[in-house]
Curated annotation (Swiss-Prot):
Domain remark in the UniProt entry: IQ domain mediates interaction with calmodulin.
A single BP term in Gene Ontology: actin filament-based movement
Record-given protein name: Myosin-8
Cellular compartments per GO CC: cytoplasm; myosin complex
Coiled-coil features, chain-numbered ranges: 884-1049
Gene responsible for this protein: XI-B
Disruption phenotype: No visible phenotype.
Complex formation: Homodimer.
Length: 1500
């Protein structure tokens, strides 16, 4: 594969081994062309230099994703790379554009989630980790962009995972081109996917190598329209293994459908007369009946469900299963010799039972079925001869019938699926997915293996041509000089097999057409024809076998059954029998044949299969191919086992080695400039000049090394075979010399260091000795000086002691004398101070006594004068109250309260008695009482009118109560005089009580009589007007504006309804000097009544006016949206919330929907987000479901009597002002909402969520392009040369992080300008940071080049910028920083030094507690240090993670190591409500445009 290289002692090489395929070792001795190698296993071998290959010791432990990037592209390198990746569960690897898939034999659901499909959508091939999704995406993108149909060829031996890979490809293509035309409720892609279970049930079986082996080839054409959506599909099948129906070898199984039907529910089993599968001959030939990993009963239901999806009706399903059951019963029919010679009949009762059952299931005649199995009709020119069959021939006839029935059934299923899916005749492009059997070579190879290997030979030729083409395109792309590369062409093998005439298939067809031909004559014909062919040999000691030298190896075929298996015709008796079936399904499987076909019964399976291959190749040649090679790592079908010899053989059979050989024929080693310089720059350090570019540096280095034949491309260096090894040898030599120099320097340094330490130690010992002697001399001198100092200090102490005693005695005598003198002086001062205090107290007492007398006299005088002034002022105030009706002054309030108490005592006594009498009279004499009331009412009509007008005037001018004159002026004057006198008597403010006693008594009598009459009349009126009063009370409660309430109080007077006559239009002078024209007021009532006839039209116009106003940006008032407040006030006034039917809500929702059509304008969206959330808050606080307040206590009816209302007014007058103020501030009013209002609230909440999502998605879209630039740092090669292909320009890499922050700041400014609620701003930032976390973290896991030390530092610096931003806008960021926990911990792990010292517990509990085992495992295996070349974590940690992953592999909860982007709505209505307050809207002003409209006067 590569040219022989010259190894040196110490070189790491690969040597061939018969057991392990290849072993790695180190060269220990070289003797000419004999090289001794010490293998890593400890074994020493001696090999020739031509049989060893160099090993790349710097290859990453986790392997490379694309094997074309291997330093040495040869068999051991490829095998080692696949094994390294398989050990870390990386089962996919590229070889250029070819994907190699190694079957893991375990569930890896995290690799195939819908989120993973989203990640690969639009990613270029090689950008992310190898995956079938990447191949499917590349095919889809190429089809859409270039308008060329594509094909994906999936191959591999049985059990390699072809079918599963095909399912993944179809899933991804359905994901990309979904939403196609639906048929009967199911889309095309759903039917294509659901066709797999049906085809697997009838076309798959357990083999020695695979529990779910496809026993047919399948080519799925997925058709697309111009826009890239799936418009149709078609499934083509090839070479179903019909012989398996009748012959099954142990431990294999028959087709799955037989076992599923036997495991069907009891009622179905009875319908088809089936039982235990062990009793059926076609199933019990093998001991394997049950599969551990497959539940046949569940698979039966899954298959029926899939049949429903693809459009197979229940009647057709019953017919299908009847045919399957009849085949099982046919297999149990055995034959014995009949009465005639060479005849046969069913052997026993059991056989007759199964014959009868099969006939019933096929709905044909039992006798006809027996005859078709035991007899043949020979037609001659003159007569028809019936020939009987012996038991052996009858068994063959039985098996032939079973095989042809199953084959026809399978063909019908494929045709039905195609019909159900529907093909698009106008399809522009297609993507074909070919799931074909791989190369097969067994101990016994029959006709099936011959056809399978022919298929693989054809596909291998197509594959070789494609690889050669791709190789030449690579050279053209890099603009290098190249010459034609020769590759092994297998055309001679294809000519040997399919050439006409003279090919093996042609000779086989010729043998089949002669009745007397046998497999031995056929073999002899082959021997004679191809005895000199280099690809054809005859095995020794074999009479009828032959061997063909295929591209993947020699295969020996046994010809015993070649002739029988090549014949494809239906026995005439079988055709007639089944065509005559009363079951239309069975009859349609065997339609009547034409006369021409009757004359030519023979049909060759080999020829037909060859024609199918030609048709398939024609389709593939018109498409752009993509290849997936599936590899089975072991024959035990168990995970974690990698058999080198087995895998290597499959790589050869799959053509991967041939592709590598083609690559090696040209330039097998291709290195990017920076990688090449980083690795081999040490050979010529002087070429790494910062001022030179990379291509020039690479050329200088290669010239310096003396290599020839290399090529310098646009981005890569292309090396011939063996040149990489030469460079590595030179590099190893330089590193070896450098190591010697380093060792010499280190030894010199260590010796010098030892000498210096000895010298320092000797110097230190000398210094210690000298110091000891000096300290001894110094100690003697110090002791002598200390003795002298002690003597001196003792003398000084004795002298000081004598002086201190003398001094203390003197001080003591002086202190005693001074104290005696001071005590005498203190006593004198105390006596003087006491005398002064006594004098002071005496003078104060006398002065206070005089002052109190003066103050008492002054207060008495002032009280008398103030009393006089107050009485005079009281008199003036009374006069002013009668003239102006103003009773709000404080003194008048006191007077009125006293008067009210007096009147209430009298009225309650009288009203209690009168009301009891009125109730008794009303119950007994309703009619007589009504006439008496009407007569009395005529007398008091004028008085009642005036009283009610006065009462209404009192309610209008709350809390000011105005006195209204009664119609009887004389009586009113008397009442007024008597009232004044009574007030004077109660308040003790008048002195003339005795003079007015008689007048008061007379006035009280007259008032009492009139009061009885008024109360009786009003009690009846109150009962008759109960409904009207309740309606008026409800309207009065809902009206908040003073003017509207004023008008309604005047216009809705109850006098009209009682008397039946309209009130007299009078003009009166009120006491405040104003005049009221009642006639004009009633004219206004009539106008309003006429206007009420078109209230609906007026409301529609008002709604239009409102919408025209608020659909524009009318701004904010005190930080709250004007539009939302205006809409709420209008809906509240129009009573829309209580309406059972209104169009206002629909109009508003439509207006909001049209306003947010521009999804890209964040400013406009933020404005409407604020308005909708504010309006939602107002509705949340205001609307109460209907019936919620049903249990609440009702308001007592308001008394309508004059004195009752006066008494109520007096009682409530102190609190009226506060109530009015509270009503003015109460912006939000609870309302019992009907269904339209509650629906409007739900729709509004949906729009809040929608607008929130639009703003969030706009920010994500803006940041997504920047995030992709922030995940990977710019790569710098040695010598400071930056890769031009990935250069980020002269700008700092931090500019992308700054752009993200600028985007966040820009949106934050927009949200703040539009007063978006704080909770929504925080949620937007939280979900955005979560999106950043998901994108960065997933990119880290999917891109190996991102898991580096330098990249970790780059991302960490960017995250620091985001953390600084969160600190600056902490109020608005909320918990956003916590959302970056995954990428923070992952990056923190990447930048740790000495990872190999970190234990698993430290990683899980301290460094990365939030990351799962799968995520940690992937980071650890992908990590590589591009700065300091340090190691990743230890193998013990990797093993621990792998063991945990194995335990959790079947856990559905751990199905993905990627993070999902959370696009849900992260808030509730209650959170929005809690973030606002009702008082915030108290100062909001409605829209100015509406305030000028008279219809919206209620907004004032």
């Amino acid at each position: 594969m590569v040219a022989t290289f010259n190894p040196a002692v110490g070189s790491h090489v690969w040597v061939e081994d018969p057991d392990e395929a290849w072993l790695d070792g180190e060269v220990v001795e070289i003797n000419g062309d004999q090289i001794k190698v010490l293998c890593a296993s400890g074994k020493q071998v001696v090999v020739k230099d031509s049989n060893i290959y160099p090993k790349d010791v710097e290859a990453p432990a986790s392997g490379v994703e694309d094997m074309t990037r291997l330093a040495y592209l040869h068999e051991p390198g490829v095998l080692q790379n696949l094994q390294s990746r398989y050990d870390i569960n990386e089962i996919y690897t590229y070889t250029g554009s070819i994907l190699i898939a190694v079957n893991p034999f375990r569930r890896l659901p995290h690799l195939y989630s819908s989120h993973m499909m989203t990640q690969y959508k639009g990613a270029s091939l090689g950008e992310l980790s190898p995956h079938p999704f990447a191949v499917a995406d590349a095919a889809y993108r190429q089809m859409v962009n270039e308008g060329v149909s594509q094909s994906i060829l999936v191959s591999g031996e049985s059990g390699a995972g072809k079918t599963e890979s095909t399912k993944l490809l179809m899933r991804y293509l359905a994901f990309m081109g979904g939403r196609g035309a639906a048929t009967e409720g199911r889309t095309v892609e759903q039917k294509v996917l659901e066709s797999n279970p049906v085809l697997e049930a009838f076309g798959n079986a357990k083999t020695v190598k695979n529990n779910n082996s496809s026993r047919f080839g399948k080519f799925v054409e997925i058709q697309f329209d111009q826009s890239g959506r799936i418009s149709g599909a078609a499934i083509r099948t090839y070479l179903l293994e019909r012989s398996r129906v009748c012959q099954v070898s142990d431990p294999e199984r028959n087709y799955h459908c037989f076992y599923m039907l036997c495991a069907a529910p009891e009622e179905d089993a009875k319908k088809f007369k089936l039982g235990d599968p062990k009793i059926y001959h076609y199933l019990n030939q093998s001991k394997c009946i049950q599969l551990d990993a497959m539940n046949d009963a569940e698979e039966y239901h899954a298959t029926k469900k899939a049949m429903d999806v693809v459009g197979i009706s229940s009647e057709e399903q019953d017919a299908i299963f009847r045919v399957v059951a009849s085949i099982l019963h046919l297999g149990n029919i055995e034959f014995a010799k009949g009465t005639e010679i060479d005849s046969s009949i069913p052997r026993d009762e059991k056989s007759w039972f199964h014959l009868k059952t099969a006939a019933e299931l096929l709905m044909c005649n039992e006798k006809s079925l027996e005859d078709s199995l035991c007899k043949r009709i020979m037609a001659t020119r003159d007569e028809t001869i019936t020939k009987t069959l012996d038991p052996e021939a009858a068994l063959l006839s039985r098996d032939a019938l079973a095989k042809v029935m199953y084959s026809r059934l399978f063909d019908w299923l494929v045709e039905k699926i195609n019909t159900s899916i529907g093909q698009d005749p106008d399809s522009k492009y297609l993507i074909g997915v070919l799931d074909i059997y791989g190369f097969e070579s067994f101990k016994t190879n029959s006709f099936e293996q011959f056809c399978i290997n022919l298929t693989n030979e054809k596909l291998q030729q197509h594959f070789n041509q494609h690889v050669f083409k791709m190789e030449q395109e690579e050279y053209k792309k890099e603009e290098i000089n190249w010459s034609y590369i020769e590759f092994v062409d297998n055309q001679d093998i294809l000519d040997l097999i399919e050439k006409k005439p003279g090919g093996i298939i042609a000779l086989l067809d010729e043998a089949c057409m002669f009745p007397r031909s046998t497999h031995e004559t056929f073999a002899q014909k082959l021997y004679q024809t191809y005895k000199n062919h280099k690809r054809f040999t005859k095995p020794k000691l074999a009479r009828s076998d032959f061997t063909i030298c295929h591209y993947a190896g020699d295969v020996t075929y046994q010809t015993e059954l070649f002739l029988d298996k090549n014949k494809d015709y239906v026995i005439a008796e079988h055709q007639a029998l089944l065509n005559a079936s009363t079951c239309s399904f069975v009859a349609n499987l065997f339609p009547p044949v034409s006369d021409d076909s009757k004359q030519s019964k023979f049909s060759s399976i080999g020829t037909r299969f060859k024609q199918q291959l030609v048709s398939l190749l024609e389709i593939l040649n018109t498409t752009e191919p993509h290849y997936i090679r599936c590899i089975k790592p072991n024959n035990l079908l168990k995970p974690g086992i990698f058999e080198n010899q087995n895998v290597l053989q499959q790589l050869r059979c799959g053509g991967v080695m041939e592709a590598i050989r083609i690559s090696c024929a040209g330039y097998p080693t291709r290195k990017h400039f920076d990688e090449f310089l980083n690795r081999f720059g040490i050979i010529a350090p002087q070429v790494l000049d910062k001022n030179s570019n990379e291509p020039a540096a690479c050329k200088k280095l290669l010239d310096k090394a003396g290599l020839e034949g290399y090529q310098i491309g646009k981005s890569k260096v292309f090396l011939r075979a063996g040149q990489m090894a030469d460079l590595d040898t030179r590099r190893t030599e330089i590193l070896g010399r450098s190591a010697s120099i380093i060792q010499r320097k280190v030894r010199s340094y260590l010796a010098q260091k030892t000498f210096i330490q000895l010298r320092i130690s000797a110097t230190q010992i000398q210094a210690v000795c000298r110091g000891y002697l000096a300290r001894s001399i110094y100690e003697g001198m110090r002791r002598e000086a200390a003795a002298l100092k002690i003597q001196r200090d003792l003398r000084k102490f004795l002298a000081r002691k004598a002086y201190t005693e003398l001094f203390s005695a003197t001080i003591l005598i002086q202190a005693g004398m001074r104290g005696m003198v001071s005590r005498k002086e203190l006593c004198l001062r105390r006596q003087t101070k006491a005398a002064t205090i006594i004098q002071t107290r005496c003078r104060v007492y006398l002065a206070r006594l005089h002052y109190r007398k003066l103050k008492k006299a002054a207060i008495t005088t002032q009280c008398a004068w103030r009393g006089k002034v107050a009485r005079k002022e009281l008199k003036n105030l009374k006069m002013a109250a009668r003239e102006t009706g103003a009773l709000q002054e404080a003194k008048n309030k006191l007077e009125k309260q006293v008067e009210e108490l007096t009147w209430r005592l009298q009225l309650e006594k009288r009203m209690r008695t009168d009301l009891e009498e009125a109730k008794k009279q009303e119950n007994a004499k309703y009619e007589s009482s009504l006439e008496e009331i009407q007569n009395k009412f005529k007398e008091t009509e004028a008085l009642l009118i005036k009283e009610r007008e006065a009462a209404k005037t009192v309610s209008e001018v709350l809390p000011i109560i105005k006195e209204v004159p009664v119609v009887d002026q004389e009586l009113m004057e008397k009442l007024t005089n008597e009232n004044e006198k009574l007030k004077g008597m109660v308040s003790s403010l008048e002195i003339k009580i005795d003079e007015t006693a008689k007048e008061l008594h007379e006035t009280a009598r007259i008032s009492q009589d009139r009061l009885k009459q008024a109360l009786a009349a009003e009690s009846k009126v109150a009962k008759l007007k109960t409904a009207m009063q309740r309606l008026e009370e409800k309207i009065s409660d809902m009206e908040t504006e003073k003017q509207i309430m004023l008008q309604q109080t005047i216009l809705n007077t109850p006098v009209k309804s009682v008397a039946g006559h309209p009130p007299t239009a009078t003009i009166k002078n009120l006491e405040n000097g104003h005049r009221t024209n009642l006639e004009n007021q009633f004219n206004e009532v009539e106008v309003n009544g006429n206007a009420g006839k078109s209230a609906a039209e007026r409301q529609l116009e008002n709604v239009d006016t409102l919408i025209d106003c608020v659909k524009e940006n009318i701004g904010f008032s005190n930080g709250k949206p004007i539009a939302a407040f205006t809409i709420y006030k209008c809906l509240l006034h129009w009573k829309c919330f209580e309406s059972e039917k209104t169009s206002a809500f629909d109009r508003l929702i439509e207006m909001i929907g049209s306003a947010i059509e521009n999804e890209d304008d964040n400013g406009h969206l933020a404005y409407w987000l604020t308005n909708t959330s504010a309006l939602l808050f107002l509705l949340q606080k205001s609307l109460k479901p209907a019936g919620a307040g049903a249990t609440a206590s009702k308001k007592p009816p308001i008394t309508t009597s004059l004195f009752g209302r006066m008494a109520l007014s007096f009682r409530s007058s102190p609190n009226l002002a506060a109530a009015a103020e509270a009503a003015a501030l109460a912006v939000i009013r609870p309302v019992e909402a009907k269904y339209p209002a509650l629906l409007f609230k739900q729709q509004l909440a949906a729009y809040v969520e929608k607008i929130f999502g639009m703003i969030r998605d706009n920010l994500k879209k803006e940041l997504s392009a920047l995030i992709s630039m922030c995940i990977q740092a710019p790569r710098i090669s040695k010598g400071g040369i930056q890769r031009s292909a990935r250069s980020l320009g002269k700008d700092s890499p931090a500019i992308h992080w700054q752009s993200i922050i600028d985007g966040l700041n820009s949106l934050l400014a927009i949200l703040k300008d539009n007063y978006v609620p704080l909770v929504l701003i925080q949620k937007i930032h939280t979900q955005t940071f979560s999106f950043v976390n998901v994108q960065l973290f997933n990119s880290l896991l999917l891109r190996k080049e991102c898991c580096t030390f330098s990249n970790g530092e780059f991302v960490k610096s960017g995250l620091a910028e985001l953390e600084l931003w969160c600190g600056q806008v902490n109020e608005y960021a909320g918990p956003s920083w916590d959302e970056l926990k995954h990428i923070r911990q992952a990056v923190g792990f990447l930048v740790i030094h000495q990872k190999y010292r970190v234990s698993y517990d430290d990683i899980v509990h301290d460094l990365c507690p939030i990351l799962s085992v799968q995520q940690l495992y992937r980071i650890c295996t992908l990590y590589w240090d591009d700065c300091y070349n340090t190691r990743s974590v230890s193998q013990e940690v990797i093993s621990s993670m792998r063991a945990l992953m194995t335990e959790e592999s079947n856990d559905a909860d751990s199905n993905s190591f990627l993070l999902d982007d959370n696009s849900s709505i992260p808030f509730s209505i209650d959170e929005i409500s809690n973030s606002m307050h009702e008082k915030d809207f108290a100062s909001v002003k409605p829209a100015k445009e509406l305030l000028e409209n008279p219809e919206f006067v209620f907004l004032h």
